[in-house]
Structures are given as C-alpha cells and as structure tokens.
Amino acid sequence: METDINRLKIVLAEKKKTNKWLCEQLKVNPSTVSKWCTNSSQPDIETLIKISKILGVEIEDLLNKHYIKTLMI
C-alpha cells in the first residue's frame, strides 16, 4: 500500500521545475517544499490550489490516486 499522499516531486520533474523554483514562486522556505516532496508533511488545501495554478495542473494531478480513492470511501 502506498503511503505517499502527494505527487509533487513527480509533477515538478514532469514540468522540469525544481524545488527551489517552487519555493520562490510560493515564497516559502526551501525545507518546506522539500518536506512536501518527500511526503513527510503536506501542503494545506489553499497551498495545494496555488501549486496547481503555478504548475498548470489539476489538483488531482498533485495527489496520489490511491489516496483520492480512500477519501471517496
């Protein structure tokens, strides 16, 4: 069973963007983005919306599909 909630690291790689770039866009500490990318912490919903707009993806693209399914049960 997968424990990763978000796919931020994967989406950043797909978009050829770095953690540093994202932290500059969001004006957050680099360690915060690093924690999100390793799934040791999660962005709040407001930040998730900002990230999706910055990266030009749907919020669902940032979340692990297995995690989404567990929310729908």
Question: What does each of the following model-derived ranges do?
Answer:
Residues E2, I10, K15-K16, K35, ...:
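Short, charged recognition helix plus adjacent turn
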Residues L12, C23, S52:
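The alpha-helix within a helix-turn-helix
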Residues N19, P30, I45-L48:
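Helix-turn-helix DNA-binding elements, focusing on the entry/boundary residues of the two helices
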Residues W21, T32, D61:
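Residues in the helix-turn-helix
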Residues V28-P43:
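Recognition helix of helix-turn-helix/homeodomain-like DNA-binding domains
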Residues E46-D61:
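DNA major-groove recognition helix of helix-turn-helix/homeodomain DNA-binding modules
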